[in-house]
């Protein structure tokens, strides 16, 4: 019970994998290299992957919750 209390007081940030996006829900292309972009944003790493409807985009592993990832319910406005 004490460990649960400590865990709640300290707080735990969860992580998730996904296509990293900007504030408009638009994916980042594979230049600059995805691994560096993902690490700069707190992820463990990343790679270039194909996303239907967007083309080549950066897929990140273990991004913190505060970094946005692609929401399939919202489209990226045309640039």
UniProtKB/Swiss-Prot annotation:
SMART domains: Knot1 (SM00505)
Tissue: Expressed by the venom gland.
Subcellular location: Secreted
MF terms (GO), sorted A to Z: sodium channel inhibitor activity; toxin activity
The protein's name in its UniProt record: Anti-insect Ac4
Residues of the signal peptide: 1-17
PROSITE patterns, per the entry: LCN_CSAB (PS51863)
Keyword Disulfide bond set for record: yes
InterPro entries: LCN-type_CS_alpha_beta_dom (IPR044062), Scorpion_toxin-like (IPR003614), Scorpion_toxin-like_sf (IPR036574), Scorpion_toxinL/defensin (IPR002061)
This protein's UniProt keywords: Cleavage on pair of basic residues, Disulfide bond, Ion channel impairing toxin, Neurotoxin, Secreted, Signal, Toxin, Voltage-gated sodium channel impairing toxin
Origin: domain of life: Eukaryota
Gene Ontology annotations of biological process type: defense response
Main location: secreted
S-S bridge residues: 26-76, 30-48, 34-58, 38-60
Similarity-based family: Belongs to the long (4 C-C) scorpion toxin superfamily. Sodium channel inhibitor family. Alpha subfamily.
Domain LCN-type CS-alpha/beta as annotated: residue spans: 18-77
Domain remarks: Has the structural arrangement of an alpha-helix connected to antiparallel beta-sheets by disulfide bonds (CS-alpha/beta).
Task performed by this protein: Alpha toxins bind voltage-independently at site-3 of sodium channels (Nav) and inhibit the inactivation of the activated channels, thereby blocking neuronal transmission. This protein is weakly toxic against insects (ED(50)>2 ug per 100 mg of blowfly larvae), but is inactive against mammalian sodium channels (rNav1.2a, and rNav1.4).
Gene Ontology cellular-component terms listed: extracellular region
